[in-house]
Design a protein with these regions (language model features):
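Gly/Ser/Thr-rich loops at beta-strand to alpha-helix junctions
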Residues: 25-26, 50-51, 109-117, 140-142, ...
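Glycine/small-residue-rich loop that forms an oxyanion/phosphate-binding "nest" at active or ligand-binding sites
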Residues: 71, 75-102, 106
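Conserved Motif II region of HX4D acyltransferases
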Residues: 98-121
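A contiguous loop/helix-start segment that scaffolds small-molecule binding in enzyme catalytic cores
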Residues: 16, 176-251
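Class I SAM-dependent methyltransferase SAM-binding "motif I" and its flanking Rossmann-like core
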Residues: 114-178, 229-230, 243-247
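Short acidic active-site motifs
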Residues: 32, 93, 170-172
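General beta-strand structural signal in soluble alpha/beta enzymes
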Residues: 45, 71, 106-108, 136-139, ...
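Glycine-rich, flexible N-terminal cofactor/catalytic loop recognition
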Residues: 4-72, 176-178, 196, 208-209, ...
């Protein structure tokens, strides 16, 4: 999708807004995100399968008025055909609402364009809504939240920053050779394999992680993975590995 419309503070009838709401704390929404949630007709929020509540919905609850609120269990399976079919059904519903003149906001944790459900929904809407009726509002991402916990720069001067999913360990090992700072999303489900890789590469002390950042008592921080003790980690676990730094380019 190209040439998306610029978004304003006030939602327009018949328009769709993919709104990043940050890591899950209401005070980390941008002013634009809060205003769109507060003034739209319909709010759509994701909820992980098996979860008792939607983290994204709880984060925007202080800004809700009398909008219709829809909570969806979005498809997270690896069956491409079934996943695409479900996203198409969701896109059809949003398109019907927009055709009826509703302003629709889909809230998503983090940023709508980084490992986010919004990206799938926007793909389905791209041929259903008129040009200029799809908007993206950026949000604070998980890797920014994780970095803020430890106060160390992610990249300086010529350093290369790479962001990827942690689920393919062989790809992670290759990435360690291609950047100075590596950010891994979805690290909780493969933490033991990651620990073994980092141990073998002597990088445990150079790696840190945050699980469930900005989610109150559920948050776990670890500044040095050599101190990690085996315990379950959530899906929303982000790891930062600082591999080194590149020499400055002198004039």
């Amino acid at each position: 999708m190209k040439n998306l419309a610029l978004s304003s503070m006030q939602p327009k009838p018949g328009h769709f807004y993919a709104v990043g709401i940050g890591p899950g704390s209401p005070d980390l929404l941008t002013l634009r995100a809060a205003s769109l949630v507060e003034n739209c007709d319909t709010v759509i929020s994701p909820q992980a399968k098996g979860s008792a509540k939607s983290i994204a919905l709880e984060a925007v609850r202080p800004f809700l008025k009398d909008q219709e609120v829809i909570v969806h269990n979005y498809p997270m399976q690896r069956n491409r055909a079934k996943t695409q079919q479900r996203w198409q059904e969701l896109a059809d519903d949003v398109a019907r609402r927009c055709d009826a003149g509703e302003s629709v906001v889909q809230v998503t944790l983090g940023d709508p364009l980084i490992f986010a459900t919004s990206s799938y929904l926007m793909q389905g809407l791209s041929e259903k809504l008129p040009a200029g009726h799809i908007h993206v509002v950026p949000g604070i991402s998980a890797f920014q939240t994780t970095a803020s916990r430890f106060g160390e720069a992610l990249t300086l001067q010529e350093d290369r920053l790479m962001l990827m999913s942690a689920t393919d360990i062989s790809a992670v090992e290759q990435a360690l050779e291609q950047c100075e700072t590596l950010v891994l999303y979805k690290a909780g489900g493969c933490i033991e394999q990651l620990m073994e890789l980092l141990r073998r590469r002597d990088l445990l002390q150079s790696a840190s992680l945050v699980s469930c950042g900005e989610q109150g008592e559920h948050e776990l921080q670890l500044a040095d993975l050599s101190q990690w003790r085996v315990e379950p980690l959530g899906y929303m676990t982000t790891m930062i590995i600082r591999i080194g730094s590149r020499p400055w380019l002198e004039e």
